[in-house]
Swiss-Prot record:
Protein family according to the UniProt entry: Belongs to the CitD family.
HAMAP family for this protein: CitD
Disulfide bond sites: none
Protein name: Citrate lyase acyl carrier protein
Organism: Streptococcus pyogenes serotype M18 (strain MGAS8232)
Length: 102
């Protein structure tokens, strides 16, 4: 999926994550994370965001995530929503997304 514009999903409420996805001219994926549980779960959160981007076939993006204790399913859902908004895609391939949970 080609990231065309900056988009945001989520909130700064407790148990949520606000994620911002922007185009990256360097043709790489960069993830910046701000989390109160970064020492415990930072690597896992980054890996989950990165894997979700790979599953969505994103090859270049700047991602900024502010975590407030979100569960994995919330992190994945917010990432999916932000990527679709940033790519200008309004149709979700639910069958493909469901296949990730095998």
């Amino acid at each position: 999926m080609d990231i065309k514009q900056t988009a945001v999903a989520g909130s700064l409420e407790s148990s949520d994550l606000m994620i911002t996805v922007s185009p990256n001219d360097e043709q790489t994926i960069t993830i910046t994370l701000d989390s109160s549980v970064e020492k415990q779960f930072g690597n896992h959160i980054r890996q989950l965001i990165h894997q979700t981007l790979v599953n969505l076939k994103v090859t270049a993006a700047k991602v900024e995530a502010v975590d407030k204790g979100a569960l994995d399913c919330t992190i994945q859902a917010r990432t999916i929503a932000a990527v679709h908004r940033a790519a200008g895609v309004d149709q979700y391939d639910w069958k493909e997304i469901d296949s990730w949970n095998v």
